Structure formats: C-alpha cells, structure tokens
Amino acid sequence: MARKSRIIIVGSGIVGASTAYHLAQLGWKDMVILDQGPLFETGGSTSHAPGGVFQTNPSRMMCKFAQYTVDLLRSLSFEGKPCFHTVGGIEVSKTKKRHQDLYRKLGIAHSYGLTDAKIITPDEVLKMSPYIDPEKIHGGYYVPTDGLAAPVRAVQAMAKYVTDLKAGEFFGDTAVNGFKIQNNQIRGVQTSKGDYEADIVLVSTGIWAPKMGRLANISLPLVPCEHQMVWLEPFEELKEFKADHKEALVEHALMRHQDYSLYFRQWNDTYVIGNYRHEPRILESEELKKPEDAEEMPSLVDFRPDDFEGAHKESNWLFPRFSEKKLTKKINGIFSFTTDGNPLMGETSVKGLWTANAVWITHAGGVGKAMAEWIVNGEPELDVRQGDINRFHQHHHVRKYLRSRGKQNYKEVYLSLIHI
C-alpha cells in the first residue's frame, strides 16, 4: 500500500533540504524527502560543490537569494561545526578595464544591500590572500560577508531540524522511476522501494531534473555541464587547519580571477582551484551513472588534463607558491546550467508538480525559503519572476537551443565583462 504524505520532495541535496527546512518553519508536517543516493552525501552536485559564496549578482533576485543564504548558513551548525566560514570574497582585476568594471559591481552591491562591499588595493588583497602576487593585479572588489559554505553539513543541519520537529522523513537509496498523474494533477511517485502518494511533489534533483521532467512528460530546461576542480599539495604553514573531516577549516579569503574564469579557495591545509576556462562539455541526464555504479559519485566524470593546462599556468602566474605544488586530486564535477543562468522555480504545467532546480549553493537558502512560501502562501515574499519555470517560450525547450545556450552560459559564468 502506498504511503500518503502532504508533500514529496524528490532530491535531498541542499535545495530539497532547504525547502523542507523552510516548510517546517512554516508549520508543515508529514513531508517525505527522497533521494536515489545515500544520505546525506547523496552523490549530486551538493556533494562535491566547492562551497564558495559570492553574493554580488546583477540580478536583484539572485543577490537577495545569496544574502539570505549567507544569513541562514551562518545560523546553522551540525555536531558543533559551522556551516559557513565568513572569510570574505575578493574578485581581483588583472586589467584596467576589469578594474573599472569592479566599480560597476560595487554600485550593484550597494543598491542591493551589500553596503559593506568596497574596492581594495593590491596590498590589502595580499593581507587576506597571502599567496597572491600583488604586482600582478590592479586591486580587488571585496565583500566581507562572502565566504565558504560547508554544503553537506548544511544539509545535515537542516535535515536534523526537520526530523527533530517530526515534520518529515528523509529516505536515501530510493530512486524515483515515475510519476502518478491523473487529469493533469500530480498524485504521487513510483520508486525503487514502492509508491508514495501526495498532491504536491517538488522535484529538486539538479542535474537529473531533465530526466525527471521527461518521466512526467514535461520539460525542465537545463543541461548538466562538466566543471574542473583540482587540489594542491598541502602547505606546511597551513598545517594547523588540517582536519579529520571533509569540510574545510579556512582563514584565507575566497578569491575569484574574472579575467581567466578561475576561483581559488583554501581547503584545510591546501588550496582548491576551480576552472571555467575550458570548452563546455554538456551531458544528458540519462548519461549519468546510478549511485551504485559510480566509482566515487555519479556527479563526477573523468578529469581532462588538456582542459586545465592554461588554467594551471595562469594560477601559477598569479599565485607563485602554487608552482611549487603538485596536484593531488583532480575532478570534473557536474553542475546545472539554464538558457539564462537563472534557476527553474515554481509550479509546472502539471498541477501540484513543482520544480526547484539549477540552483547553486550560493542561492540555495533563498530559493528554499521562496519555494516554501510559494507552496504554502501562493506567492513568495521576493519577486522571483526571473526564476519562474513558466518564463520560457517554446523555443527555449528545443534541445539544440538549450545545449547551445547552456554552453555559452558556462563560458560566461564568470565574465560579466566580455571582450576586454
């Protein structure tokens, strides 16, 4: 006999957990949260995300999502460990045009409530990021409240809140294989462990969203795309930050090098480099491995060394100490991209079937809050029209167009200033 509940959330990454958390805050109970992977490192994008949170965004909606996410994560802890490290975020400028553009970002930040943002000198950058060569930059754009999230720990903290309130239950290793739909109304889901019934179902499966959409005969227009991350050998002077757990203890500021589509973050006693400066590599949801078939996790694929050569050279140029270190871990992780870079939120064409996908860690807290308000009250507090799933026209769902725009958005994810 199928289990009945008030709502089923498919996907227990940070977006699904955030929505459940905020629904519980609004008094909802009898929630079921399902995931195909093991709890709570389920194998999706949340499980390997670098955790960097840069709040500044030309979209007011996205900027507000990020600001709320920082506030939320700073309020959370799990087993005595924080879910956010407020180390600050710095975008450095290699060129004069980039440095001029930082002032545009500063204006955006101030108008959207990031009033502590400011432009800083190369020497000030050096104080917060001691491995950078200050002679290579014109300065930096600094937001003190930016920082580093511990994504899996945040999921654990929010899930604990939900279960402690007896507001919902989380079930891992439970793959959704189909949807029950009658007269265009969602009635439940079919899973590898039986059927679940509910008149509200939220899909928050990230890179698997297109596959979930096809199971329900709707389009969730995003593309999974590979993204490179590497870990360096440890730095002796950072040994005090070495930890016996996966989430990082950090002190150095989160760094972004917009002119080469790179970011850098301290990770315990070493550094991680993230690279967007490579050919976009688009996948289909159906190509992704099942959790039980993946060597480490299904959201990771083989690293491509050729794609990293230019990024490696540029990183060593900007951070000379990096040239002394070998690469100890290399991954191509998979994240979601849409045609316009905004998330897929709201009720779909099937009544009661909702989506919250293509959401980064940066915005997950705010998106979860908005989704809960939308489901409970009929509309969220924040204007989220830029993220509404119903914003798309017919051509936006054409696979060729979607892949083309997804590739372009990947190329430009760090390039608010093009052709400099």
PLM feature spans:
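Central helical "cap/lid" subdomain
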Residues: A198-H245, L382
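Conserved small/polar residues in nucleotide/adenosyl-binding loops
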Residues: I418-I420
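Dinucleotide-binding Rossmann-like beta1-alpha1 core, especially the glycine-rich loop
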Residues: P50-M128, D259-F264, I282, S299
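Glycine-rich FAD pyrophosphate-binding loop
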Residues: A24-S45
